[in-house]
UniProtKB/Swiss-Prot annotation:
Domain of life: Eukaryota
GO cellular component, one term: Slx1-Slx4 complex
EC code: 3.1.-.-
Any one GO BP annotation for this protein: DNA recombination
Biological role stated in the UniProt entry: Catalytic subunit of a heterodimeric structure-specific endonuclease that resolves DNA secondary structures generated during DNA repair and recombination. Has endonuclease activity towards branched DNA substrates, introducing single-strand cuts in duplex DNA close to junctions with ss-DNA.
Region Disordered, residue ranges: 155-192, 290-323, 595-628
Protein name (record): Structure-specific endonuclease subunit SLX1 homolog
Segments forming SLX1-type zinc fingers: 446-526
Oligomeric form and interacting partners: Forms a heterodimer with a member of the SLX4 family.
Length: 705
């Protein structure tokens, strides 16, 4: 599935010498492409590099299912006279040049039979330039048709002036007959430009008085939003768009649900593509103001209240044009018109009320007595209010689109299950987590064929999660084609009134018409109109957001594990360095011990070894004490004192009591006493030697003359 962002953009030059020059192109990132055209990045177009820099983006059209449809739109916009979609309607644009010509072509192209069934969105970056170009196109087209008088440009004897005066007189009489006041005509110079005195007023008056070009009116399948470059990048081009959702930023906690199974975690709300905060607020506000319907047959349903307090969305997305609804999220519509049986926004109320009201904006199918009409109700009229013109290729002309019948009775508003009355953010997050668990384990059946669904390619109703329609994309296409065929058979076989004949489907535009639905169909569960283009667009948007949510969660988990690993490494490094310092101090102490003790331990061991290996007679014989045993200092003691001349060590070496070898006696305890005294003297020498080895201080240096 191609989930890229396909759009066709319109550029215009800001160079005063190239005023009005335009460029039309296709890309998946219009902001990056604009930098390429301006020379900031490489791989720009040759046409925009020669002259006209700097360029600015006026608008772009998005919502194409794949690159082929977007490239077709681009080619038709670039070559309107050669296109089969506009060649029969492009004659009305004769005389237009530069940017007004491109804008007028856009007005006609979005209503062509090939593109009016797609869920397209017009993103306007420079609304002033777009409105000015459309107004100038209206003025020039009206002047070419002879509806305005050129001030001072032609002579009175010219036959063209007489034709213009006759047309002006006829239009004035027609306006008086209709009871409509004809606005004053603006004055034009010889070049066809408006005079400076009344430029803005003339443009506004001309646009309001004569609609030679079909207006860009938002509808179910055509959306208009006035945005900025930063908001556009955050909403459509940023890979961290999912992190801007309040449900992801807040980290909805599902409480004890994480202990029930492995598929539920404490952060299940972060994987929900819906704005659970907005859903809970809308449901709470709706149920607090809703009341039971008097003609309701089901006690478990309620009608939607006409009033709903406004609840702003925290999702940063551009504001829609000509609508007071909140920004649209996944699976919801926000541009439904009052002509389609939808509640219109009032100054004191918000038509959106978040995602809940957008999901309830379309009416359900009317009740019918026959089983056929109950299962497949007839299609609604007035589906796309923006499709005021449609090119009929076989007949070679521009025909008016089907309009809703004035005699049609207003359909009842859709109903909502009562189980959502007490739903909060945690409940929506838990329900979505459970549904995703069932979907990934093959436990979620299709609503139409009851076969298990596979992830990603699942079609949802526009009222999701309030509507439980979950089905395969192919099953939904077959259902819509079947409903369309049933409606056509009902119109052709039973009733042939003019109102129903206007609902007949148009002529097929391609051999693949039987595979792709071309008409909307009511939902089999809730009755809301489902448009194929909107469903495909929402499906791709859902797939993209879910992938980015999973990627963001994976990145967050990796960062947490990396931080934990770094903390463990830091702790290990600190403990290792402390152990190394302890070992170093131990080695220094051992070296000082060996240096302070000198040869005393070796001599004692030698004496003990010789004593152990002598014979019994030799051991019991009386021994003569050496002078050192009588208290005289030995050479070893003097050597130790000279090497580490401390007062305690010197005194211990010179005193008879501290000698290492006392007088030997003939009893058996003499060897034990000698060893004990030797160990005590060695310990005292070690402590003093350790202290002096750490300081390079020598007492004899101070005593020398």
């Amino acid at each position: 599935m191609d989930t890229r962002f396909h759009c066709v953009y319109l550029l215009t030059s800001l160079d005063p010498q190239c005023e009005g020059d335009f460029y039309i192109g296709y890309t998946v990132n219009p902001l990056r492409r604009l930098r390429q055209h301006n020379g900031e990045l490489v791989n720009g177009a040759r046409r925009t590099s020669r002259r006209g820099r700097p360029w600015t983006i006026v608008c772009c059209v998005s919502g194409f299912p794949d690159d082929r449809a977007a490239l077709k739109f681009e080619w038709c916009w670039q070559h309107p006279t050669a296109s089969a979609r506009l060649r029969h309607a492009i004659d009305i644009l004769t005389g237009l040049r530069r940017l007004p010509y491109a804008v007028a072509t856009l007005h006609l192209l979005v209503r062509a039979s090939l593109f009016c069934r797609l869920d397209l969105t017009l993103h306007i970056f420079e609304s002033a330039l777009l409105q000015e170009a459309a107004a100038r196109a209206e003025v020039l087209l009206a002047r070419r048709r002879g509806a305005f008088a050129v001030g001072g440009g032609l002579r009175a004897s010219s036959p063209r002036v007489g034709t213009q005066q006759h047309s002006q007189r006829s239009s004035s009489l027609q306006g008086q007959a209709d009871g409509v006041a004809t606005p004053p005509l603006p004055a034009l110079d010889s070049k066809g430009e408006l005079q400076d005195a009344s430029t803005a007023a003339a443009l506004a008056t001309t646009t309001a008085a004569s609609h030679l070009l079909p207006p860009l009116t938002p509808s179910l399948l055509f959306h208009v939003e006035d945005t900025t470059r930063q908001a556009f990048e955050d909403a459509y081009l940023s890979h961290d768009r999912c992190l801007l959702l309040p449900s992801v930023g807040m980290g909805v906690d599902v409480g004890e649900a994480g202990k029930e199974g492995s598929h539920m975690s404490a952060s299940a709300g972060t994987s929900c593509p819906y704005d659970v905060s907005l859903l809970s607020q809308a449901a709470r506000a709706e149920w607090s103001n809703a009341s039971f319907a008097s003609d309701s047959d089901d006690e478990d349903t309620r009608r939607f209240a006409p009033y709903c307090p406004s609840t702003g969305s925290r999702t940063p997305s551009p504001q829609r044009v000509h609508t007071a609804a909140s920004p649209a999220l996944l699976g919801y519509r926000s541009e439904e018109r009052a002509g389609d049986g939808v509640l219109e926004a009032s100054p004191g109320s918000s038509i959106g009320c978040g995602a809940a009201l957008r999901s309830f904006s379309s009416p359900p199918p009317p009740r019918a007595s026959s089983p056929r009409s109950a299962s497949c109700p007839p299609l609604y009229t007035g589906i796309n209010a923006s499709a005021s013109l449609a090119v009929d290729a076989p007949h070679g002309g521009v025909t008016d689109a089907c309009t809703s019948s004035p005699a049609a009775a207003p359909a009842p508003q859709p109903r909502i299950p009562l189980r959502f009355a007490d739903y909060g953010e945690v409940d929506f997050a838990r329900a979505h987590a459970e549904e995703q668990h069932r979907l990934h384990h093959g436990l979620l059946p299709c609503s139409l064929c009851t076969l298990p669904l596979q992830p990603s390619c699942v079609a949802y109703c526009s009222r999701a999660p309030f509507c439980t329609l979950r089905c395969h994309l192919s099953c939904l296409a077959m259902w819509m084609l079947y409903a369309e065929a049933e409606a056509a058979a009902t119109v052709d076989g039973t009733d042939k009134s003019p109102a129903l004949l206007s609902q007949a489907p148009p002529a097929p535009i391609s051999p693949l018409r039987r595979l792709i639905p071309s008409q909307p169909c009511p939902c089999p569960l809730c009755g809301v109109l489902l448009h194929w283009g909107s469903l495909v667009k929402e499906l791709k948007k859902r797939v993209v957001v879910e992938r980015r949510l999973h990627a963001a969660q994976r990145r967050i988990r990796m960062e947490q594990r990396w931080q934990a690993r770094l903390a463990h490494i830091d702790h290990t490094k600190r403990s290792t360095s402390a152990a190394m310092r302890r070992r170093q101090r131990t080695r220094v102490g051992a070296a000082a011990l060996a240096k302070g003790a000198g040869e005393a331990p070796g001599a004692a061991s030698t004496v003990r070894a010789s004593t152990m290996h002598v014979g019994p007679a030799r051991r019991d014989a009386p021994r003569v004490s050496s002078p050192s045993c009588l208290g005289e200092p030995t050479l070893t003691s003097f050597a130790a004192a000279a090497s580490c001349p401390s007062p305690s060590t010197s005194l211990a070496a010179l005193s008879p009591a501290a000698s290492a070898s006392p007088i030997s006696r003939h009893n058996g305890h003499s060897n034990t006493v000698t060893a004990t005294n030797t160990a005590v003297a060695a310990a005292a020498a070690v402590s003093d030697a350790s202290l002096l080895s750490l300081t390079d201080f020598c007492e004899e240096d101070w005593l020398l003359p």
